[in-house]
Amino acid sequence: MRECISIHIGQAGIQVGNACWELYCLEHGIQPDGQMPGDKTVGGGDDAFNTFFSETGAGKHVPRAVFVDLEPTVIDEVRTGTYRQLFHPEQLISGKEDAANNFARGHYTIGKEIVDLCLDRIRKLADNCTGLQGFLVFNAVGGGTGSGLGSLLLERLSVDYGKKSKLGFTVYPSPQVSTSVVEPYNSVLSTHSLLEHTDVAVLLDNEAIYDICRRSLDIERPTYTNLNRLVSQVISSLTASLRFDGALNVDVNEFQTNLVPYPRIHFMLSSYAPVISAEKAYHEQLSVAEITNSAFEPSSMMAKCDPRHGKYMACCLMYRGDVVPKDVNAAVATIKTKRTIQFVDWCPTGFKCGINYQPPSVVPGGDLAKVQRAVCMISNSTSVVEVFSRIDHKFDLMYAKRAFVHWYVGEGMEEGEFSEAREDLAALEKDYEEVGAEFDEGEDGDEGDEY
């Protein structure tokens, strides 16, 4: 088996996690108490969904997941919610004291006390796997727990499970909508370790997803639940090929191989189509060509950056539902002829496609319409650098005056860590610039010394 362990850290990670597991359960017909009436092989078996669920002898399906937070309120909602019987109580780890939006508290003082417990639980899950493929890590880098404890866990996972791939789904601060003043600090410090310790990171951004909900689903005032359900569709599409059998299956390591041209250039944009409300879906013909086009629309991107300002290096299209390879090839050919979608000149093919025959499921009473086919795109575009340059700019404004820095130093950090992380991000911005530049100086000009 190719099992994946999901790790949900901090409030954002946990709430996205709730939406994802709710959707997985729907897709596989698993009830909130973990029973699965349709499962013929009770107590194990080699079903494809066993990559995400482990089965007990009593026929109960338990998610291979860990939820961690430094304060109890969010995890208590899981403990008392609809899916309280789905999770093993040991999988829900909560501390007593908040990270208070402070990276240093999440990484050094408070996170340090809880991290061994987390690794212990992860070790138990890993021992329960026959062929662990990797980790999916969900967190946000604006807060204290997601950024601090998230980085700490990633660093420790690299030590304990060196070769296993780590995919991050990371919520980055939005340009306009901010939830805390020190977001830029936390994000820069946290990205510093995301660079080292994740193999692929998919960037999400609340503002971009708000706009998609507002525009495509006509929700006037989207809530986090609306956002998370949209994000969970993306994550479900990515992992569908691990959980179902399909025509062109893509596993986690394939993403890495096809999307990451250089180790540091691994921050991805994602988009999903069709995002459409039930009223509209009834009147529209959502062909493969149409949904492929709308996945490339700048307004469909789930992070606030405009792919027209950069070039694509590679992209991965995951179709699900009633889709045949012939349609996909035609749709991709059309995309390639478009002038607005530019690829770097050193990556001529640039497309990786996967097809899964399981049609997309939707949460009953949710916002999305039930459709016959859908596509999720993960793309590596140089325009992602906009996300970083925005955060870096805000970081510089604050750090020039050393505003709020004493809170971090008081928790045992050194100022040197700030400048080190900031320099690392400056180097990242430069890397993206070089990758997007046309090659004039032969194959490999000044990139030889980088790696």
Curated annotation (Swiss-Prot):
Enzyme nomenclature, EC number: 3.6.5.-
UniProt KW Metal-binding keyword: yes
GO terms under cellular component: cytoplasm; microtubule
Cofactor(s) listed: Mg(2+)
Ligand binding (Mg(2+)): 71
Catalysis: reaction(s): GTP + H2O = GDP + phosphate + H(+)
Any one of the GO BP annotations: microtubule-based process
Binding site for GTP: 11, 71, 144-145, 179, 206, 228
Record-annotated active site: 254
Record's subcellular location: Cytoplasm, Cytoskeleton
Transmembrane segments: none
Predominant place of localization: cytoplasm
Pfam families named in the record: Tubulin, Tubulin_C
Residue numbers of N6-acetyllysine PTMs: 40
Post-translational modification: Undergoes a tyrosination/detyrosination cycle, the cyclic removal and re-addition of a C-terminal tyrosine residue by the enzymes tubulin tyrosine carboxypeptidase (TTCP) and tubulin tyrosine ligase (TTL), respectively.
Keywords assigned: Acetylation, Cytoplasm, Cytoskeleton, GTP-binding, Hydrolase, Magnesium, Metal-binding, Microtubule, Nucleotide-binding
Family per record: Belongs to the tubulin family.
Role according to the record: Tubulin is the major constituent of microtubules, a cylinder consisting of laterally associated linear protofilaments composed of alpha- and beta-tubulin heterodimers. Microtubules grow by the addition of GTP-tubulin dimers to the microtubule end, where a stabilizing cap forms. Below the cap, tubulin dimers are in GDP-bound state, owing to GTPase activity of alpha-tubulin.
Name of the protein: Tubulin alpha-3 chain
Name of encoding gene: TUBA3
